[in-house]
Amino acid sequence: MHVLIIGCGYVGERFAKQAVERGWQVTALTRSQKRAEALQLAGIRPVIGNVLEPKSLQALPQADLCLYAVGYDRSANENKRDVYVSGLKNVLSEIADRIPRLIYVSSTSVYGESTGDWVNEETPCEPANESGQICLDAEAVVNEVYARNLNRDATIVRLSGIYGPGRLIGRKEQLRGQKPISGNPDGWLNLIHVDDILQVLFILASGTPSSSLYLLSDERPNRRFEFYSELAKHLQTPAPVMPDEPSADFGKRCDSLRIRNELGVKLLRPTIQDGIPVSIE
């Protein structure tokens, strides 16, 4: 198995290293020479390039699968739509004819639900903000490109809020400093631990999924106050400081029953009570 990874960040790098451990051949796109050297030391073949520079993508190899997990780097001073949509178009125009399978990592921000109702793969997408619309537009690019290519398959995975080791740093500082935490305390949070993201991505990469779209979230949405209270308990800090003003935004609750049923996934961290203790460093 040869996998090409576009977006070797929090999720992509972990996937790459585990793929190497499985004996897979792994190639990853990176923008910097220093990063390329680190990837090479980990057994990953680097290709230096940028999704916004089409000529730099010509060196991307033929592979069995592409995992596309590009995140938005605010420090890069690049437009989010350019990165998510134009960059995706650039990559797919280069690889779609020679890499038969794509796993595209998207976001549950494509749903605009704010009343606390449940959403799943069948729920109409009505993004509430520009970020969600950009993610939805990127999904449309994937569907359009792969609909034109026979014997080519694309799977879109919409992730809820990612957490895990190294992803709770800002939250820890807020709690320890007793700084007010924004958002409706009674609003719903939907989370997925990085261990479960990796588990699902490897299942998708190793088999032939029956659906082209999956939503991935843990088994129990939590009220915002509940999440921060659980985190505070494990950090041994005072209870979270939350705003008192009423809010009409209760968010959404994500139902990931399809992915658990169709792929036979048994989540490693099905609730925050399982995931937070293994995420605190």
State what each model feature region is:
Residues T115-I156:
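Catalytic helix-loop patch of NAD(P)-dependent Rossmann-fold dehydrogenases
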Residues L136, L150-R152, I162-E173, Q178, ...:
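Glycine/proline-rich active-site loop of Rossmann-fold NAD(P)-dependent oxidoreductases
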Residues A63-I103, A140:
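NAD(P)-cofactor binding segment of oxidoreductase domains
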Residues G12-E13:
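N-terminal Rossmann-fold NAD(P) dinucleotide-binding loop
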Residues V200-F250, S256:
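Mid/C-terminal beta-alpha module of Rossmann-like enzyme folds, strongest
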Residues N90-E130:
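Conserved Rossmann-fold NAD(P)-dependent oxidoreductase catalytic core, especially the SDR/UDP-sugar
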Residues V3-G7:
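Conserved N-terminal Rossmann-fold NAD(P)-binding element of oxidoreductases
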Residues R45-L52, S247-E281:
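C-terminal amphipathic/interface module of NAD(P)-dependent oxidoreductases
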